[in-house]
Amino acid sequence: MTIHIYNTLTRQKEEFIPLEENKVKMYVCGPTVYNYIHIGNARPPMVFDTVRRYLEYKGYDVQYVSNFTDVDDKLIKAANELGEDVPTIADRFVEAYFEDVTALGCKHATVHPRVTENMDIIIEFIQELVNKGYAYESEGDVYFRTKEFEGYGKLSHQPIADLRHGARIEVGEKKQDPLDFALWKAAKEGEIFWESPWGQGRPGWHIECSAMARKYLGDTIDIHAGGQDLAFPHHENEIAQSEALTGKTFARYWMHNGYININNEKMSKSLGNFILVHDIIKQYDPQLIRFFMLSVHYRHPINFSEELLQSTNNGLERIKTAYGNLKHRMESSTDLTDHNEKWLADLEKFQTAFEEAMNDDFNTANAITELYNVANHANQYLLEEHTSTVVIEAYVKQLETLFDILGLELAQEELLDEEIEALIQKRIEARKNRDFALSDQIRDDLKDRNIILEDTAQGTRWKRG
């Protein structure tokens, strides 16, 4: 089975064929580290970590690079407001980023380059563009000359004349064309700066990724990925810079994930409806958040609400409960061989369907459907009077493998005796208040955690299943 990827560049699904056999070069745009990331910022790391995990599962050696922009207008503004220097703020939020995405199940990239640690190659890249006539200096700034790059607009699929007409920035004294963009910005008084052939300053945003991608992955990479909002102008400008310099294709497959809405409204700081990962992982299990994010195809928008999160949690708990029941039954199973082939053949079908979903542009939504199928099938098997260790182990291994591909964990924390007693007391109060819906919900939730309740004349007794 071959993998097909929807390529933003061609607007169609294409068979994935890496430049080098069994090797994948992948670049994912990382955050500007001036604050904690919100859940919209967290979607790309989770999505493309899953892509990476699946490629590795299929036998590819994935070189995965994701950068940190640690000098930027937003960082400078934050430094001025807080009375701290830019490096201090950047270091703090790099650490916070790692804490957040690690909690969400993301592995570290092969390399996490920082702009400030690669200033020499960025300046060299800009100088080469100037030498080739693709860039020009203007009063200490350096701009990319878009009209010189014939393919400008090919990622956003817009003619350059239309892009120029819709450009927000008018031609100023420094720029020759509205679409020209900054490669180097002259430092303002009091700003952090680096020495360059054009004076003191710092790089523009777009050039940073081009330079670091080239340094760590070469002139042409297999997959370049990021949020949908980066397609234009960021990724469009990366293509222009890189291909103008090398004359080679910059990236062969472009992947972009969709937006996140909050309660059916677009998430934005202006509306004040954004949710920081730093906060939400204190309210909800980070694994649930990842499972929720992967329950929707990465190119589609996600509507984020507590109701949907709770519904997703119920599904995740069903799978975890099935897994726990399998592990528990393993001890009492035998080497029974009757009917083994039938159950194992069904498991093979689920595995194939899971891989077919992932091969189809990493459709995690359909892949998760197969997790539910495995769990339901396992529950049916556990109704058998006699169960086989071979089949039980196959179920357990399959669930563990598929969860690992998605960056998820199956371990379910065991409830403490005191927690169980507290829930039973809450159920007793609910029954006194004739809130039978809540009473039943508590009983069912405990059952899902392998806690069996028995109501007697002497009170409610419980035992672990």
From Swiss-Prot:
It catalyses: tRNA(Cys) + L-cysteine + ATP = L-cysteinyl-tRNA(Cys) + AMP + diphosphate. One of its GO terms (molecular function) is zinc ion binding. Its EC number is 6.1.1.16. Its main location: cytoplasm. SUPFAM superfamilies: Anticodon-binding domain of a subclass of class I aminoacyl-tRNA synthetases, Nucleotidylyl transferase. It comes from the Bacteria. Zn(2+) binds at C29, C209, H234, E238. The gene is cysS. It is found in: Cytoplasm. A motif ('HIGH' region) lies at residues 31-41. This is Cysteine--tRNA ligase. A motif ('KMSKS' region) lies at residues 266-270. HAMAP family: Cys_tRNA_synth (MF_00041). One of its GO terms (cellular component) is cytosol. Its cofactor is Zn(2+). Keywords: Aminoacyl-tRNA synthetase, ATP-binding, Cytoplasm, Ligase, Metal-binding, Nucleotide-binding, Phosphoprotein, Protein biosynthesis, Zinc. Belongs to the class-I aminoacyl-tRNA synthetase family. Monomer. The modification Phosphoserine is found at S270. The lineage of its organism: Bacteria, Bacillati, Bacillota, Bacilli, Bacillales. PANTHER family: CYSTEINE--TRNA LIGASE, CYTOPLASMIC (PTHR10890:SF3), CYSTEINYL-TRNA SYNTHETASE (PTHR10890). GO terms for biological process: cysteinyl-tRNA aminoacylation. It is an enzyme of class 6 (ligase). Binds 1 zinc ion per subunit.
